Amino acid sequence: KSLICFLYAKYSKDDKFISHFTDQFNSEKYKDYSDGNYYNLVLSVSGLDKSISISNYLNNFINSDSPQIEARFRSSLPGVSDPETPKVVIEAILNETIRGADAPYLLAGLISHHENGKNAWEIIKLNWKDLLKVMPEWTSSRILDGLPSVYDEHIGKDIQDFIKLNPLPSAEKLMKQKFERLNANIKFKNSINSVLKKAKFV
């Protein structure tokens, strides 16, 4: 049910539906919920509202009173639609507010965000060497996990060109797999767009 609710909120952009969750987030009523799935749903749907600040999520992550709550907020960070999200999250990684071991997964999430992905990638490129320094070498390749969710041809090409020139440690095989998936997705999207342009709707 939680997944269905989130997908509905994400793709329908039903303001009334989303505000039901943002009201709970702003009032902090959700913090009293024992149902972990619903708690996570409030965080994920509220993050779709651009008026909800990433700083709110990050502060809750920093001040969480249990490992479980910390994990919930950490995993929610990349999905927050606030335009400042990429900058704030990447700064938190660089100053080690967020553990380096968790960084690749969050960077992957930032890249795959449907609205903030392009900006996230630009900031990641600018800080590439410093980001690699704060994360364990064996986890850095997980940054590539965000590539299958990229459908923009220009961003996809830029990512591939950059990573080929600035390869991740011990990630040659994974890089090839992710690039193949990325290119397949872009090709599929382009073919669908081509069909739709030629289609005649009565």
Segment roles from a protein language model:
Residues 1-202:
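Long, ordered, helix-rich scaffold segments
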